[in-house]
């Protein structure tokens, strides 16, 4: 699926513009409109982010998070990636499952 079936392209562009210099997942989730989406739509977004279909979003996929929204977006740096993981990985297994993702978006 495509991310634009769930999110508005204008909102995505605004959210990406805010991430140019630094990434804050909460700001991104709110600006992109993710926080208002149903669990079913969040699961769709999760499936897009889970590029290797492992059922989890791992560190390498978090690093490329923004590129799921725009191919030309930057990679997250190590500090941003680690903070993003820490925010979502409530069971501390080093990756983010779909329920953890939904909880992080709605937090």
Swiss-Prot record:
InterPro entries: EF-hand-dom_pair, EF_Hand_1_Ca_BS, EF_hand_dom, Parvalbumin
Residues annotated for Ca(2+) 2 binding in this entry: 89, 91, 93, 95, 100
Thermal response of activity: Thermostable up to 240 min at 100 degrees Celsius. As the heating time increases, homodimers increase while monomers decrease gradually. Melting temperature (Tm) is 79.2 degrees Celsius. Reversable thermal denaturation.
One Pfam family it belongs to: EF-hand_7
Keyword Phosphoprotein assigned: no
Keywords, in A-Z order: Allergen, Calcium, Disulfide bond, Metal-binding, Muscle protein, Repeat
One GO CC term on file: cytoplasm
Binding site for Ca(2+) 1: 50, 52, 54, 56, 58, 61
Domain EF-hand as annotated: residue spans: 37-72, 76-107
One GO MF term: calcium ion binding
Stored Gene3D superfamilies: EF-hand
Expression (tissue specificity): Expressed in muscle (at protein level).
Functional pH dependence: Stable between pH 3-11. Homodimerization increases with increasing pH.
Keyword Transmembrane helix carried by entry: no
Subunit structure: Monomer. Homodimer; disulfide-linked.
Family according to the record: Belongs to the parvalbumin family.
Listed name of the protein: Parvalbumin beta
């Amino acid at each position: 699926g495509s991310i634009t079936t769930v999110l508005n392209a204008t909102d995505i562009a605004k959210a990406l513009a805010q991430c140019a210099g630094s990434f804050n997942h909460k700001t991104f989730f709110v600006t992109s409109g993710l926080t208002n989406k149903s669990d079913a739509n969040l699961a769709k977004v999760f499936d897009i982010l889970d590029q290797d279909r492992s059922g989890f979003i791992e560190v390498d996929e978090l690093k490329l998070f923004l590129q799921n929204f725009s191919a030309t977006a930057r990679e997250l740096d190590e500090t941003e990636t680690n903070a993003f993981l820490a925010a979502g990985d409530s069971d501390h297994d080093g990756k983010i499952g779909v329920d953890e993702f939904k909880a992080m978006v709605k937090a």
